[in-house]
C-alpha cells in the first residue's frame, strides 16, 4: 500500500530539477541566525515565497508556473540557533545531527576534499541555512533576491 504525498508540504527542489523547467539563473545564499527571534521572523516572512512540489507544467506560458523558485535547507546548528526545542531536535537522525564534517569519510570528502580543506565558512557551525533562488532570467533573479 502506498501513501499519497502532500506535495504542498514538500519543497519543490526535492522533486524538480529547476534547470530543466526553464530556470537557468540561480543564486545561493548561506545564512546565519544570530538572534533566534529575528531568525524566526525572517522565516515567517520568507515562507510565502517558498516553492512547493505542487505540480506545474514546464511550458513557458503555464499559468501556475512561478516566475522564480525559492527553497531553503537548514543545518542542525541552524535549528539550534533558531531555538528549536531540544525535544524536537532529538527527533532528527544522527546522520543529520552529526553534520557533514563528522560524516566526511562516508560522503567521500577525503584528500583535497577533506574538511580541513573546506572554505572557512564551513568551520565551526557558522552556516545555519542555505537559500536557493532560481529564475527564468537575471532580472527576475534580482527582483526576488
Where are each of the predicted segments found?
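Long, low-complexity, Ser/Thr/Gly/Pro-rich intrinsically disordered segments that act as flexible linkers
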Residues: 1-145
Amino acid at each position: 500500500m502506498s501513501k499519497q504525498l502532500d506535495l504542498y508540504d514538500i519543497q519543490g527542489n526535492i522533486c524538480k530539477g529547476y534547470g530543466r523547467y526553464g530556470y537557468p539563473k540561480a543564486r545561493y545564499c548561506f545564512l546565519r541566525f544570530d538572534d533566534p527571534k529575528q531568525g524566526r521572523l525572517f522565516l515567517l516572512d520568507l515562507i510565502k515565497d517558498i516553492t512547493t512540489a505542487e505540480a506545474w507544467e514546464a511550458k513557458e506560458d503555464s499559468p501556475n508556473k512561478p516566475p522564480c523558485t525559492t527553497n531553503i535547507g537548514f543545518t542542525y546548528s541552524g535549528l539550534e540557533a533558531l531555538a528549536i526545542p531540544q525535544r524536537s531536535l532529538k527527533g532528527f537522525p544522527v546522520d543529520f545531527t552529526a553534520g557533514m564534517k563528522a560524516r566526511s569519510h562516508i560522503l567521500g570528502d577525503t584528500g583535497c576534499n577533506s574538511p580541513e580543506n573546506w572554505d572557512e565558512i564551513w568551520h565551526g557551525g557558522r552556516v545555519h541555512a542555505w537559500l536557493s533562488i532560481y529564475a527564468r532570467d537575471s532580472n527576475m533573479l534580482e527582483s526576488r533576491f
